[in-house]
Amino acid sequence: MAHYEEVNVRGYDEFCQAVSERKGKDIFAYFSGDKDASGKSWCPDCVTAEPIVRGQMSHLPEGSVFIYCQVGERAYWKDSTNAFKKTLKLSGVPTLLRYGTPQKLVEEECFKADLVRMMFTED
């Protein structure tokens, strides 16, 4: 059994609900472009980053939560007024962040296994 909880959500409302149901826990969130029926995201950087991020998940802190969030279709994501950009201040996908902290890896930073591991292991 994993030492962390993984939650898969789609869209801003589901993300907020997942966070509110886990108040007080150490939450890591990974934001990716939506996947199609074949499981491939419209975002090429997300396709590159996902196996790297998943490869470091064994380093997640005991009892933490990993939320995998699909941000929506490309047209929704590109709209500068979408809730992810307005409220969470996301600037690109993929983004990996430690919720409630300034710690954030954006786009190509998510390709670097050492940076991902540091985020999962540093307080």
From Swiss-Prot:
Disulfide bonds join C43-C46. The keyword Glycoprotein does not apply. The active site is at C43, C46. InterPro entries: Thioredoxin-like_sf, TXNDC17-like, TXNDC17_dom. Keywords: Cytoplasm, Disulfide bond, Redox-active center. Induction: Up-regulated in liver in response to Singapore grouper iridovirus (SGIV) infection. 2.8-fold induction after 8 hours post injection of SGIV and the expression increases up to about 70-fold at 72 hours post injection, then decreases to about 26-fold at 120 hours. Residues 41-123 form the Thioredoxin domain. GO terms for cellular component: cytosol. The record marks P44, D45 as: Contributes to redox potential value. The keyword Disulfide bond applies. Belongs to the thioredoxin family. This is Thioredoxin domain-containing protein 17.
